[in-house]
Amino acid sequence: MKHRTSFILTAALAAACSLAPNPSLAETKPDHAKAADSHAGAAAAGASAAAAAIKPGDVINKGNVDKVSDLISPGVKAAVLNGSELSIVPYAKIPIPKAYIEATEKYSGQVTLDDKNDLKNWVAGRPFPTVDPNDPKAAVKIMWNFGRTSYFNDDLGVHLPDADTGAYFKSGDGKPTYQIERHFIVDWSRNLRFFGRLHHDPRPIIPDNPDQVFNKQGFFPLIEPFDLKGVGSVSFRYIDPTRQDDTWLYTPTIRRVRRLSSAQRSDALFGQDIDLDSFGGYAGQIPWFDWKLIGQKPMLASLHGKNLPPKICPGDGGVTYCEDWELRPKMWIVEGRARVHGYAYSKRVIYVDDEASMIPYSDLFDNNEELWKVVLINIRSSNQPNPHVDFKYDEERMFVYGFTVLDLQLGHGTRAAIPGMAFPEEPGWYIDRGLQAPEAVPMDWYSIPSLIAAGR
């Protein structure tokens, strides 16, 4: 183990040091590239020292979190200072599906960005396999790699996830407390892609697409809490990048379907803390933000979790999950500012793992540029979404099995588990199973009539 640990840390240090600028090239670079190199060099130095100070088997808590400040976001650090813990394990490679790798090799060479930062000539796979940090479009390319990640390519279903929301604080005797105010259970969350399909026919596109959408998503009906029973939403994301998403919210108690604006997608609904655009790290339109690359460096992330259901942290009363974290060789740090008037956040600072093109955490800032929220995502890799299920994938896939959103200013948090804590035998995730899978639904499930019918 000692020899293996030394190898992992050496590799991480080498990755960090590779970010430092080459003095012999500095004079030939434009000013923005010099600034990027300077920032990367400083980040690399801090990350190198921090990486050398940790090893697998360590537990990061509020007593020693300062030594990894350069390896986590300010939001993650705030969560640890509140009582969360990070158990350090060795780095492990993220498996990428063979079909996705083949599509990347076949199509990526033809992909470009237009003047509005929309993808052109993309068919399937990773749009930009290699990103030059000195490219003025680097941040946009990183976000498109995330937007077209291998996480799912055809369809996605989540059955019976549950979530709790409430205040977290120290009680009168100093005990960390998470006071749950509401418990949420939703029947289904489904997402159907019409483009970039790799695993089941029709592929790479669904030709029958009268709504001209890239994907459709449904989240309904809510089963709990009782006063929100039947509430749900349906969203369409269109092929045309200039067209706003259509998101319809149905509330049975007033028998009303309401259309949400793009700005309202940043609002946290029903007394909990996550907004529609924060699911998965970022679920908004990529061309509708101005993106800037802050840097790249090794950082810690939770990408190979072991616990199902996720392990609740006792140190903060249970508002976060105490899971395995590893030193990832390269994490991109990207800042995004919405072009939409009235958006709730002044900026999002998003951390994207280069190998997986996944977002393990992101920090959200208020209109005064103060840190407001942190989104923490726990990911695991397996050929089964849950060991109890009766189906397996031919390859390992990634599954988000837990996430937490902390409102650091209000002292309020929402945690979710997939599968839900009350349904430990449930698969939870159904990823790329195809239109003929037993749990599949007809196309008209993604519609307002279906939304209303399910909510009655």
What is each model feature region?
Residues 27-134, 268-301, 305-306, 313-318, ...:
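Non-transmembrane domains of secretory- and envelope-associated proteins
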Residues 176, 195-211, 223-224, 279-350, ...:
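Extended beta-strand-rich segments in extracellular/periplasmic secretory proteins, especially
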Residues 221-224, 228-280:
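An acidic-aromatic
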Residues 326-391:
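Extended, compositionally biased non-globular segments
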